[in-house]
Amino acid sequence: MEDGTAYYYDDNGNLYRIDDNLLPNTEYDINGYRYETDEEGRIVSAEGRLQVKDHEGRPAIKDSIEDIGKGDQKKTDDRGHLIGDQFNGSNGMENMIPQDSDINRKDYKALETELAKEVAAGKEVYVKVEPIYEGDSHRPVAVMVTYTIDGEESVRVFPNEREE
């Protein structure tokens, strides 16, 4: 922290965040995963070979939903991990989006559980998560997950809306 400003650096020593803002048009690596932001400083891609973390427990999420959503979040949103905590995904805004709590805790979690079983079975699992935005909103309308298990690719799209 210099002059009250917080600077955040990735695994390679590259600056990717200042205070509560991810830098625009930036690629950064956190815990072995590669992330990319767009011109608005929104995460547009998170990818890497999934690894199961080697410690128990879950650290507190570092950033508020307000900081992550920039005012575009909904009351029903969670701070959703792009790369799940069980895969050693970061617990900061560099790996988070405003995600509908029903989607986050049910369908998205079910996919993470399925992928964790594949990793535990010794399979090579690579994932690319791409939030899809409309306009300049920091809340994605959907999340596209492309995953490859031992060379076989699949795609799932999760609308970021609660089913009525």
Predicted regions span which residues?
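Long, low-complexity, intrinsically disordered regions
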Residues: 1-20, 25-27
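Domain-level detector of nuclease and nuclease-like folds
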Residues: 22-164
